């Protein structure tokens, strides 16, 4: 049985680091989905340009390349989503909630829906969504973002229950602050950068989940920060 990997958002700040790790693992074929082509190359890599995946027709188009097969187990990791924050509820524009539900929840819903249809006709598979720490532990000034990410967790946990019937496992990672250039600028000089989780480390977590996709399902993997252990 072959194992094929799909990465959505492969060329973003998180996705690029994760992809660099995963392309070195033993997947028979890897599909990289992003709005911009990734520079990573390999004989087993196929790059697929995507549009706005909150649009159902764009999701259908993205998955049109992937063909179901009883000889293939499919794994999908998505980094797609958006962020807004910094305002109390009474100062928050309703459009901010709409945007977060579109970019975080609706996109995840549609990816899960159409990926499940492929897995249903294949040997099995696993999907791993990117949620957020604040989707579990509320923080001030992040209601639209937190609500949307909390909903992604509910989506994954319910899909894990339903997925038993089609040999599909579903999980989420919930990182706190990821070590990206944008987050470093936002945190400023007072931040302990050694505590920030590196995209490449998340890549290893993703691979571990997919290595054990038959037994790990319905799980939220909380990533609160790195332990500051000297190498």
Where are these regions (language model features)?
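N-terminal Rossmann NAD(P)H-binding glycine-rich loop of SDR-like oxidoreductase domains
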Residues: 11, 15-20
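Conserved mid-core segment of classical short-chain dehydrogenase/reductases
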Residues: 60, 81-98, 141
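Catalytic Tyr-X3-Lys loop
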Residues: 90-109, 128, 152
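Active-site helix of classical SDR
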Residues: 112, 148
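Alpha-helical segment proximal to the catalytic Tyr-Lys
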Residues: 117, 160-162
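Residue(s) in the substrate-gating loop at a strand-loop-helix junction
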Residues: 132
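Conserved Rossmann-fold SDR core element
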Residues: 153, 163-178, 215-223
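C-terminal helical subdomain
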Residues: 172, 191-231
């Amino acid at each position: 049985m072959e194992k094929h990997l799909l990465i959505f958002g492969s060329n973003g700040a998180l996705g690029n680091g994760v992809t660099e790790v995963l392309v070195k693992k033993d997947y028979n074929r890897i599909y990289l989905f992003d709005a911009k082509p990734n520079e990573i190359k390999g004989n087993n890599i196929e790059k697929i340009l995507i549009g706005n995946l909150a649009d159902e027709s764009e999701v259908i188009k993205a998955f049109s390349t992937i063909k179901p097969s009883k000889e293939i187990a499919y794994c999908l990791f998505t980094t797609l989503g958006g962020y807004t924050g910094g305002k109390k509820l009474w100062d928050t524009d309703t459009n901010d909630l709409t945007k977060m539900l579109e970019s975080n929840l609706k996109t995840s819903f549609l990816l899960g829906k159409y990926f499940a249809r492929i897995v249903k006709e294949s040997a099995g598979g696993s999907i791993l969504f990117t949620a957020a720490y604040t989707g579990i532990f509320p923080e001030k000034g992040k209601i639209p973002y937190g609500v949307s990410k909390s909903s992604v967790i509910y989506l994954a946990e319910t899909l894990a229950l339903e997925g038993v019937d089609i040999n599909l496992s579903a999980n989420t990672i919930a990182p706190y602050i990821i070590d990206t250039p944008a987050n470093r600028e936002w945190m400023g000089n007072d931040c302990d950068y050694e505590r920030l989780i590196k995209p490449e480390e998340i890549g290893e977590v993703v691979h571990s989940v997919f290595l054990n996709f038959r037994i790990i399902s319905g799980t939220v993997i909380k990533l609160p920060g790195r332990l500051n252990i000297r190498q």
